[in-house]
């Protein structure tokens, strides 16, 4: 991180006023590199895949996020240290102290696990603490004197989803089709302490591909059918196994990956990362456990 700062890639935002965790400025080289990565991403999704790009506001009205489940469920489990009064992400503290599966634990179970663990800020034993949910969205009011509540978008997907009727007409009422968006998203992270890994404002590049529920065979699947990717499925995680390197065709045939569309875009994502210079030996795709998946997800990989 220090090298990146010295060379003009990134700097702490508002540094002359002390800065704030989770917000960064891209310096001259960082802004240039970021644009080049976005250009490569567009070369895959817009030029090669043929998806059109849209641009939506970063502020959305409350009904959008009520419908998407973000108002009710877009939260992390938080705890406050009784000694230094620092707010901490409870599952991260538990995981750092050897608690397996901390992300899937209930608030009550986390409270019990944290009892003998040290605070990651001051080092004191946490003791009896209450774990509670903290919603990660930034909220605001739209218009002067208005009672219309809004939020800074936590991801770019919602704009694409709310534009679906218009997009469907644009694509002449035919599935499948895709739409992409590159833009800022915002998450009020509890303790953004991992450099650029967990920011409060960040750029997302997102593609949403709409397919018929009964038509999940990708028309160009052969392009990536033989593409091999290390996959860490649910069963391997539960058995403490290692990622298994296999082709996308094999992953679909074995039922590890839900369908050809999911497999195609796992491979395409890997292809993009390798294209921008990421070492392929450092990549693996991990399947979300059933307890981690969003309510709408049949399959999900990171």
Give residue spans per PLM region.
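TRNA-recognition modules of translation machinery and tRNA-sensing kinases, especially anticodon-binding
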Residues: 1-302
């Amino acid at each position: 991180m220090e090298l990146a700062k010295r060379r003009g890639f990134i700097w702490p935002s508002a540094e002359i006023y002390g800065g704030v965790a989770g917000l960064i400025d891209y310096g001259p080289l960082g802004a240039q590199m970021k644009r080049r990565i976005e250009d490569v991403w567009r070369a895959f999704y817009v030029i090669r895949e043929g998806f059109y790009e849209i641009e939506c506001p970063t502020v959305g009205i409350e009904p959008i996020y009520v419908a998407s489940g973000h108002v009710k469920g877009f939260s992390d489990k938080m705890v406050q240290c009784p000694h230094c009064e620092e707010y901490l992400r409870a599952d991260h503290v538990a995981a750092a102290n050897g608690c397996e599966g901390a992300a899937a634990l209930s608030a009550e179970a986390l409270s019990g696990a944290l009892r003998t663990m040290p605070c990651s800020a001051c080092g004191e034993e946490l003791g009896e603490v209450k774990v509670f949910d903290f919603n990660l969205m930034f909220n605001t009011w739209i218009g002067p004197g208005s009672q219309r509540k809004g939020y800074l978008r936590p991801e770019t997907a919602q704009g694409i989803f709310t534009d679906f009727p218009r997009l469907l007409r644009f694509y002449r009422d035919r599935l499948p089709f895709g739409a992409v968006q590159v833009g800022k998203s915002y998450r009020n992270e509890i303790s953004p302490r991992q450099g650029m890994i967990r920011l409060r404002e960040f750029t997302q590049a997102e593609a949403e591909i709409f397919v018929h529920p009964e038509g999940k065979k990708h028309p160009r699947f052969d392009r990536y059918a033989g593409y091999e990717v290390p996959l860490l499925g649910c069963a391997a995680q539960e058995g403490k196994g290692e990622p298994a390197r296999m082709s996308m065709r094999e992953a679909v045939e074995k039922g590890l990956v839900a369908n050809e569309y999911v497999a195609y875009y796992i491979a395409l994502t890997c292809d993009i990362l390798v294209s921008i210079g990421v070492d392929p030996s450092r990549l693996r795709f991990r399947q979300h456990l059933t307890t981690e998946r969003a309510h709408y997800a049949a399959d999900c990989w990171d």
